[in-house]
Amino acid sequence: MATDGASCEPDFSRAPEDAEGATAEAAKKEFDVDTLSKSELRMLLSVMEGELEARDLVIEALRARRKEVFIQERYGRFNLNDPFLALQRDYEAGAGEKEKKPVCTNPLSILEAVMAHCRKMQERMSTQLAAAESRQKKLEMEKLQLQGLEQEHKQLAARLEEERGKNKHVVLMLVKECKQLSGKVLDEAQKLEDVLARLEEEKKKTGTLEEQLSAEKRKSTEMEAQMEKQLSEFDTEREQLRAKLHREEAHTTDLKEEIDKMKKMIEQLKRGNDSKPSLSLPRKTKDRRSVSISVGTEGPVTRSVACQTDPAVESIDHVKKLPLTVPVKPPTGSPLVSANTKGNVCPSAALGRPGIDRQASHGDLIVSSLPTVPPPSASKIEENGPSTGSPSSTPPLPNSTAPPTVQTPTIAPQSHAQAAPGHSLHSPCANAALHPGLNPRIQAARFRFQGNANDPDQNGNTTQSPPSRDVSPTSRDSLVAKQLARNTVTQALSRFTSPPAGAPPRPGAPSTGDVGTCPPVGRTSLKTPGVARVDRGNPPPIPPKKPGLSQTPSPPHPQLKVIMDSSRASSAGAKVDNKTMASPPSTLPQGNRVINEENLPKSSSPQLPPKPSIDLTVAPAGCGVSALATSQVGAWPAETPGLSQPACSESSLVIPTTIAFCSSINPVSASSCRTGASDSLLVAASGWSPSLTPLLMSGGPAPLAGRPTLLQQAAAQGNVTLLSMLLNEEGLDINYSCEDGHSALYSAAKNGHTDCVRLLLNAEAQVNAADKNGFTPLCAAAAQGHFKCVELLIAYNANINHAADEGQTPLYLACKNGNKECIKHLLEAGTDRSVKTRDGWTPVHAAVDAGNVDSLKLLMYHRAPARRNSLHEEEPESGVFDLDQGEESPEGTSKPVIPADLINHADREGWTAAHIAASKGFKDCLEILCKHRGLEPERRDKCNRTAHDVATDDCKHLLENLNALKIPVRISGGESPPGNYGSDDFECENTICALNIRKQTSWEDFSKAVSQALTNHFQAISSDGWRSLEDGTFNNTTDSCIGLSTSSVRSVMLGNVPWSTGQSFSQSPWDFMKKNKAEQVTVFLSGPQEGCLSSVTYTSMIPLQMLQNYLRLVEQYHNVIFHGPEGSLQDYVAHQLALCMKHRQMAAGFTCEIVRAKVDAGFSKEQLGDLFISSACLIPVKQSPMNKKVIIVLENLEKCSLSELLGDFLAPLENRSTESPWILQKGNGTSECYYFHENCFLMGTIAKACLQGSDLLVQQHFRWVQLRWDGEPMQGLLPRFLRRKVMNKFRGQVPSPCDPVCKTVDWALAVWRQLNSCLARLGTPEALLGPEYFLSCPVVPGHAQATVKWMAKLWNAVIAPRVQEAVLSRASVRRQPGLGLTAARSRPSQGQQAVVKVALSILLNKAVLHGCPLQRADLDQHVADFKGGAFPLSIVSSYNSCSRKKGESGAWRKVSTSPRKKSGRFSPPSWSKPGPSEEGIKVKAISQLNYNRNASLSKQKSLENDLSLTLNLEQRLSLGSDDEADLVQELQSMCSSKSESDISKIADSRDDLRSFDSPGNSPAFSATVNPRMPVSPKEVSPFSSHQPTECSNSQSKMELGVSRVKSFLPVPRSKVTQCSQNTKRSSSSSNTRQIEINNNSKEEI
């Protein structure tokens, strides 16, 4: 501003350009005063006034300065007071006049400098003014916001007060309702108890009634059996009486004849003829005797034959009433008869008796006279294979062999139905539907000759029919002749009328395939059932063919050349020239075309040029092939408009081509299997072109002379030679089209002849020529699936987006027929996916309508490349879409290409692709559509229906879960475990399941789902084994066996929002989770803070009931000690119980304190007393008890002597009163008395399995909680913990027991149990391990090696050192009494080292490696990581040099066989009698160590005798026995337990002492046996006689460096005693044999 003001002053001394610059600068800084507000104008005025004042002051100062300077220059140039002036004076005096400069500058320059300074100050002031203005504006805005916030705060405070009042009212109402509901609950609980009691009573009554009913049923069945037996006996007697009656009648008639003869003889005698009657009488008598004999023996046989035939006709009506039962395959338990057994076995009356109506006597005769060989209908095989109604089929039997089945009473109810001829699953006209269009006379002849059910079919089997009455030899001969004649005619007719069978491997060779399991493609005719003779007139009307009828095959026939009769135009046939015709499979729809397979190899003999064969289609049922269509070569039925139908469609097509046509089910490029090229070449060479079939003529004979027609024929047949010849002719129209508009290129593309298409395209045929329906060659090739033709046509610039008359594009047709390769080529060519038909359908609709998943995936995800330069250019990898990956996670691999508008496009009816997929039940297609994020499943059609409304059940479920949220449910264990129980062993949170929350899910459903998930999880982790939640094996009770249920839940967090079961919010669960971004549901269990132990139970897997019992013991008895093997969670349990007690006492209003003390070896009783006093647990006698609760936890008490530490405190702790004080002796000789008050609780932990020595004196003063490894809670803790760990890895799911993770976990559990079992047998309880060390077992799905590596680390760091220490401590109890335990451990002898290594090796093989889930090769790689897995044999052999006591005898160290000592493992040795040598003892010990086959007491020692083992060990140690030898024997007996057969599979056979084989599973082998070869049980030799041989064989093998042979045979439990007795005999042999064995072992070393 000052500058502006200054510039307004006239200054004539300035240059003109300076004035112009100042004017421009003033113009720039000028602003509009009118726009300023009043306050701004005031401020501007004040600023301008200040500047004016400043300008006046400056002017005055300048004037004064100018005056002063003028005076100074004129009058005061020289002033002595100023040295500057003196210097100036000298300067002026010393220089010339011209060189002198003025003393001061021009006043105008000074004025300009002052004005420049004023300008700068003006600029600074302006910037400061603008900043001040902006700050003022911000301050005003903040004031306004503050006022608004204050108003909102007041409003919210008022609302809060209102809500508080409402909430208070609601809370009061809820309290009242809760009280009412609690009363109701109690009433309902009482009612429920009453109802349950009544239910139990009713169950008991029902059980008694069921028992009575079962007893009555048993009685009734017994009575029925007795009645059946009596009836059978009565039937037998009746038959016998009938036979006897017949014999008697015959005898009576004979006697009557004899009487008549006697009368005649008497008359003759009377007449005087004495000689002749006397001679005839003996003959008659002789005849009479022979007749009587024949009647008695042959009568019943003749009658039995009559019984098979005569009553059959009478009982037909009766039999027809039976249920339809056609047994085809006899039961597996029926006995078999050899093939040479005759069929006329004498029947038994009780054999094959039916359980049906027994009133008619002829029915019984039918059954009683049945032969034991079943009728052929039982194993009947029709001419074309097994019958369609039979559940299974038997292979055909040869004619010379009788059916090898005998009917037993087990199938008696079916035998009568087998004998009944009228029951069959076939219809009388079942075969008529299979050959429509044939001559009725041929069908009638076939029907007639197949009508005889007794005729054997081509497989040599006969069907059952009523036997003929005439059994004379002449009738039988004629019957055989008739059968042969009918069989011959039937075979000829069957070959003529049925489609030819597949090519046999050898003409005339029998079929070796199993007809019942995999039927080959065969003839489709069915043989008519064998019923009574049918009238041989015309056959019954032909029923329509059923699509679901499974057509049974027939064995292949030799090639038969059938020549058609030219005069018979109505019969269909085909001329076959050494080609095998294959019928389509029976599962294809009607009208399948019959295709030609590969030509059989031609014979070397010269033949005429082959004529092209004609493919005929089997016409649909009910419509025969017309005479014109079958007799004329060029017949072509009218085709329905459009190419929407696949190659195998319902329309009947006759396509003469020698190329196997590709059906829509399995499209194959026809160009890759051109089998008729040689035929076509021969045809072209021979000039026999008129026989080529014209393809494109619709009815009538084809004009065979036209060249365009020949061109189309050659293109249709794929005759490249003829086509090239025709294309070389001049004047030929290659674009000629027939009446349907089909060009030669169209025909070649439709039939997939790629070479023909290439020739025509090179000849410049029109690539986009359309037929009368608008289809181009590309449309035809895409519809038929000829992707090679499609690729070729696209390369020649065919219109890929051409739409037919109905709007179908090539892409649409390819999607409709599911031609994947064609779709890929079209998409890569850049075809439009959004072209719509007249009906509004897109290719997406077509693909979904066909249910083709691959086509839909290609449409949605296949990206077209940027450009394709040439035909043979490879596809870029970016455009390739992996169908398999796309199915799993298409979003992860690529995003959908098609937009949301196309996926949601609706047709004329309003249906989208989702509607079509849902209505048809195509769940896979619908799932792919749902993965598109732009899908609108709520889109409605014109009938206002969504896809969900028209969907099937599966698709409805999919749509309902479309937008479902998968929220994991986790359980938090509450407090983290103290000390070394860190997060490595105890997971903070465990996933139990994932909830699917849908939009329609209510809070009630959500609460039920959470509760059910918790219940299922608790039951799953506490169940035995790996039982899935879906098995239904869990109880319906809410509590699990560990005591947890939904009542154990403290709170639930939905993300970060607290929620309680049954609580509802205004929003639905789905909206609530979405809005709050809740990613998980966390369940918190009640813990010690609430005075509960549920969280402790879940964290430690100790049952809640047991923890509550422990807590009750502490609260009731005040003094409790927890003891068990190391790692039994004693410290954790004690600490959690202390926390729970503390919070309970605090909730009751008491103050409580927990004092933890870790005891070590230097902890004295004085320090313990100070701890009691400082924690106010011990108070002076004069002081009254206080209300403070004190909980003292003493940990690691096993490190000190309990009797020394607690000896003085035992009485005061037990009697807590002033009468039983504890006296504290002070240093000055004074003492003070203290006592324990009732509010003090003492808990201790001991990591020791059992107490010994003086520590037992403390036992009676405390309550002891023993945590045994083989009892609860420790026994089930580890399985439950690891099962929960596995479920957490599998996100709450229980894997199948076959899963490798389950096997690995089971192996870890087995290691812990077997290890402790073996250590208990060894008598080393100090080495027992609790489950704590195994809680860190890694659970890595698919990587069992991680668990084995972890086991190796655990073995090397924990298990092996403990075992080594325990074994050394036991072996050195008597060895070095003077040195003590530490000296023995620090300097173990050589024998002790050997024993330790033996123990480690045995434990490793028996307890750790046994049952390892790894393969043998993988396990061998990890065995070296285990310490003690193998040790050198020299160390063990030096064990022989160890000195023994002189009184020890080898003879008395042998096993005693007295009955009194058989029950123990080892009888105490007697030292009274001296032995002949000590070498036998040494030999026996080392031989038993090296060759466990000599372990005499191996198999009868089991794991149940731990107590006797301990007693025996104590006795032997007390008698001064050699502890090392005892340990070796104990190790050996442990090694030869029942699981040895399994150990031998795991142990490495190449290590000398890793495999300990027992005599129960090692047979005698020679030295040449392959060690890997399994041995059959037949090769096992008696153990008693071959035991020395086994030892010598194993010795020789080890000397030769060959690994020892291990047996893989299991040891039956029943043979354990036998084996042990046999080995006893061998081990009790002379010592010389043992010495020899020892010598062998030395040589080996």
Swiss-Prot record:
Repeat (ANK) residue spans along the chain: 706-736, 740-769, 773-802, 806-835, 839-868, 909-939
Signal peptide: none
Modified residues (Asymmetric dimethylarginine): 495
Job description of the protein: Regulates the dendritic spine distribution of CTTN/cortactin in hippocampal neurons, and thus controls dendritic spinogenesis and dendritic spine maintenance. Associates with the striatin-interacting phosphatase and kinase (STRIPAK) core complex to regulate dendritic spine distribution of the STRIPAK complex in hippocampal neurons.
Species per Swiss-Prot/TrEMBL record: Mustela putorius furo
Modified residue annotations for Phosphoserine: 1521
Keyword Phosphoprotein: yes
Residue stretches in coiled coil: 119-276
Keywords: ANK repeat, Cell projection, Coiled coil, Cytoplasm, Methylation, Phosphoprotein, Repeat, Synapse
Pfam families the record matches: AAA_lid_NAV1 (PF25408), Ank (PF00023), Ank_2 (PF12796), CortBP2 (PF09727)
Biased composition (Low complexity): 1620-1634
Comp. bias intervals (Polar residues): 407-417, 451-477, 580-590, 1558-1569, 1582-1597, 1635-1645
Subcellular location: Cytoplasm, Cell cortex; Cell projection, Dendritic spine
Quaternary state and interactors: Interacts with CTTN/cortactin SH3 domain. Interacts with STRN, STRN4/zinedin and MOB4/phocein; this interactions mediate the association with the STRIPAK core complex and may regulate dendritic spine distribution of the STRIPAK complex in hippocampal neurons. Activation of glutamate receptors weakens the interaction with STRN and STRN4.
Keyword Disulfide bond: no
Molecular function terms, GO-annotated: protein phosphatase 2A binding
Region (Disordered) residue spans: 1-28, 269-293, 366-435, 451-478, 492-612, 868-898, 1442-1479, 1551-1645
Cystine pairs: none
One GO cellular component term noted in the UniProt record for this chain: postsynaptic actin cytoskeleton
Protein name: Cortactin-binding protein 2
Chain's gene name: CTTNBP2
UniProt xrefs under PANTHER family: CTTNBP2 N-TERMINAL-LIKE PROTEIN (PTHR23166:SF9), FILAMIN/GPBP-INTERACTING PROTEIN (PTHR23166)
